[in-house]
C-alpha cells in the first residue's frame, strides 16, 4: 500500500493492520514528514502495528555547514550516477532493501495535463534504461523486484535475522550539482521544444 503524496501517520498504519494489509511503502521523508519520530525512516524495513513498512530511500545529497538536505530516491529527481552510488553504499552497509519511486508520467514532457502537446522525456528515460542495465549486470548483488515479492523475501529474512536499522546514506555533493544543472538545461530545452511543437503551422 502507498498513499497519495506519501501522506502517512500512525493511524494509517493501524488501519492497514486492521485491514490485513501486510506491506506498506508510505514513508518518503523528503516528500512528506509526519513529524512523528517513529516514522522518520530513511531506509531498511520496519514493523509498525505488525505492518512491514518499506520506506522509499531517503538520503542526504548535500550539506553546507550545519544545514543538510534530504532527498527521496526517484528517477525524476536523481541522476543515474547518484542512484548507482547509493546502491553501492546500501550494499556495503547490508541494507536489505532499497525502494525507488517513479511514475509513468515522468517519462514524458507535456505542456499541460491534457497531453495534447507532449514529447518523450529523454533524460528520465535514459536514467531508467541505464539503471535497468546496471541492475541486470549486477544480479549477484541486486535483485530487481516489485513490492509484494520484496515484502515476502524481506519478511522471511527478518524472521531469521531481525534488522531494523535506519541508515541515512550520503550521496555526493558534486554529483548533485551536476544533476541540478543537467535537469535545468533539459527542462528549458523541453519547454522550448514543446512550444515549437504546439505552435500553429
Named regions from a protein language model:
Residues 2-3, 121:
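A generic secondary-structure micro-motif detector
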Residues 77-200:
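C-terminal domain-boundary segment and adjacent tail
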Amino acid at each position: 500500500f502507498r498513499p497519495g503524496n506519501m501522506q502517512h501517520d500512525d493511524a494509517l498504519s493501524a488501519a492497514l493492520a486492521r485491514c490485513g494489509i501486510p506491506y506498506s511503502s508510505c514513508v518518503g521523508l523528503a516528500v512528506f514528514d509526519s513529524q512523528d519520530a517513529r516514522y522518520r525512516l530513511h531506509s531498511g524495513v520496519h514493523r509498525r502495528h505488525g505492518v512491514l513498512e518499506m520506506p522509499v530511500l531517503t538520503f542526504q545529497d548535500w550539506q553546507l555547514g550545519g544545514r543538510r538536505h534530504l532527498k527521496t530516491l526517484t528517477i525524476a529527481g536523481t541522476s543515474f550516477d547518484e542512484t548507482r552510488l547509493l546502491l553501492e553504499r546500501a550494499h556495503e552497509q547490508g541494507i536489505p532493501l532499497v525502494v525507488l519511486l517513479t511514475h509513468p508520467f515522468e517519462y514524458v514532457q507535456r505542456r499541460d495535463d491534457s497531453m495534447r502537446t507532449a514529447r518523450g522525456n529523454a533524460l528520465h528515460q535514459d536514467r531508467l534504461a541505464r539503471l535497468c542495465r546496471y541492475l541486470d549486470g549486477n544480479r549477484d548483488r541486486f535483485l530487481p523486484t516489485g513490492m509484494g515479492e520484496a515484502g515476502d523475501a524481506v519478511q522471511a529474512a527478518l524472521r531469521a535475522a531481525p534488522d531494523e536499522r535506519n541508515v541515512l546514506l550520503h550521496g555526493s555533493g558534486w554529483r548533485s550539482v551536476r544533476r541540478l544543472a543537467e535537469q535545468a538545461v533539459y527542462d528549458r530545452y523541453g519547454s522550448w521544444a514543446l512550444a515549437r511543437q504546439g505552435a500553429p503551422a
